[in-house]
Amino acid sequence: MKPPLNMSRSNKPLTQEANSSAHIDRAHQLAQDFNSKQDDTALTSLPHKNPDIFRFENNITAHSSRRGSLYRDSDATVVLPLSEHTPRLSMDDPYRQLLQQAEISQLRSKKKRHSSRVLRTSFISFVVLVSSLSGLDQGLISGNVMTLSFQKYFHYPLTSPLGNIVSIVNLGAFMASLFVYSGILEPCSRKKMLQISTMIYSLGAIVQVLALNQWCLLLGRFLLGVGMGFAFSMVIIYQFEFPLPCIRKRTLISIQCVSSVIAYSFGIWINCAFRYLGFAWRYPLSTHVALGIILNLMSFYLILESPSWLLKQKNDVEALVLISNVFDDGNFEENQTQLKFRVLKRDILLKSHLQKNSYPYAYILKDFSSIIKLLIGFQLLTRTNGVDAFLYYSPLILQQMGRGERKSIYLTGLNALIYSIVILAYVPLVLRKRKEKTNVLLGSIVMCALLFTISFTDWFPKSTTRYISILFAVFLFTHFISWDSIGWVMTIELLPHLSQAPVILLVSNFYWIFKWFVSLITPILIDRLSWKFYLIPSLSSFISIIFVLKIFPIETRDERLDSDDDSTGNGSGNHDDVFDDTGSEFSSSPSFSAYQINTLGSSIKQNNQAYSSIQNEQILPKNGNLSNQTHGSAQNVYFITSDSGPSRTGEFFSFHNRTDPNISDNIAANKPSSGGGQNSPGDMAVA
């Protein structure tokens, strides 16, 4: 006699056992019978579409191998019997209920799910496109403002109005970046902010293309800069809140810099292609409109919400579903998904503990002030070394050397082509770890010599101008391999993972304001100083040599203070590979009482001990007392412990001070034996 079948939504388990090989076929048959009985056209009917097979967990049999079928268009669920040999998990596991809710939430979702590869590729592509916006604008506007059609339409603007037209986009980006750094948008959805930024960018691009006078052009370029800076800042927050294990952060930064170079070359040749048409200055600028449409579509349909933001909003179920979709194609049982969720949850707790009720990024100003000053110095020297002057005003410089309007634009295009080809050939070396101090020092020396040579071009014959453009290409290449990405790479080299995003946000403000200042005064200085102008960036390069010799930190030469793998949950620690292996093994079920937190170290050494992968004995001695550093200040050691029980679903962790008597027994119980098991605190990476 056939056992009764439970077709209700209560999902009560059946008592009859069934072989695992027949589970799927039987589930399909039961689902088809249910569909035929309901006679509802809204339900998915077999065999036209197979229902999703999923792993179901009820309140009694956690992590069982029960399988069922669920229609996307209804809540009807078919539950199959449980085998008596199925391994069971303790009811006290706090991850179990969240896992069950996440699986059900994902299966009942009617949204189309993309594969993990598509989602990761879309995210990386979006980051690269946003990072190339500035380079594209440099290429488009540098040649555009010197075309005859632009000069006639805007009544031959002088050096000061020309500087305003070129530089105002950087001013808008600075104001948007400063607004993001203010912390006002911290509670806002990352995805919505990205969508708003791309819409502002598109609006600015349209106003710029349809400009009727200089004021409309300035307004359009200002809005373009606001959208650019807004998107750039939100991408920084997004990529550091949700780093992908398939690509290292250092590699992603290098790829962003390369994409900016390619976009610059693309913008230059767009100008060359349309310069003979009527209203030739409008067609190249319309490239911004096309790119804005692409970014809008990607932000709406391919970019997911930041799981860290979801965890901040206590939406742990949605965060787990999102992590599973990105990393394991929706498979919640993979260790990578579970460990990534736990690591992000730990980071959110750490950051909330550091921020408390104060300004969101206040703690970095107190604890990393010396590093921040160093990074700001890098940005100042990078922008004043002459790179922005050549990128924005290369056609203007060549015209002052005696070349005509047409030849100056084509020589700039040749310059950009050589620049891009050499950079692409150098990409494999850029992505590898290098001796940063030696590299930056040699680059400063070469740039100083090149700029000093270019300053004497007024005495050269006019026929040698083409060779001067080659010197520009050599200068730009030298700058790229030495100074272009160092200000950003140093951030991930010197700072712990939790502080990298806010520090980069702060440094990006100075990046935009320095860029605005240089692009504003360059045409004025070129007009008034002539050949003496090149002595200014030459002097800046000479100061860079002294800066590198005296101030450049030595920590990045041999080993990094923070691990990309630690931030993504990857314990492989293989830094020789550019791309990490997505299939690398992950430690299972880490003991959260093993994570120790040293709050707010006042020096690089203390922060290294607090945040890097070190042994617990370096922070907490065996006698249980708080250790004193060489600086004489006692460290506050905290523990992240697990709160079990169904009443705490979604909130598994809490902070406890080491001296709290309520957890003394728990800490002693979690102390590893002399044998040292797999999850012993001595083998775990601290936050």
From Swiss-Prot:
GO terms for cellular component: fungal-type vacuole membrane; membrane. The keyword Transmembrane applies. It is a multi-pass membrane protein. This is Putative metabolite transport protein YDL199C. GO terms for molecular function: carbohydrate:proton symporter activity; transmembrane transporter activity. Residues 144-164, 214-216, 273-283, 432-439, 491-500, 555-687 are cytoplasmic. The modification Phosphoserine is found at S90. The keyword Phosphoprotein applies. Belongs to the major facilitator superfamily. Sugar transporter (TC 2.A.1.1) family. It comes from the Eukaryota. It comes from Saccharomyces cerevisiae (strain ATCC 204508 / S288c) (Baker's yeast). The chain crosses the membrane at residues 123-143, 165-185, 193-213, 217-237, 252-272, 284-304, 411-431, 440-460, 470-490, 501-521, 534-554.
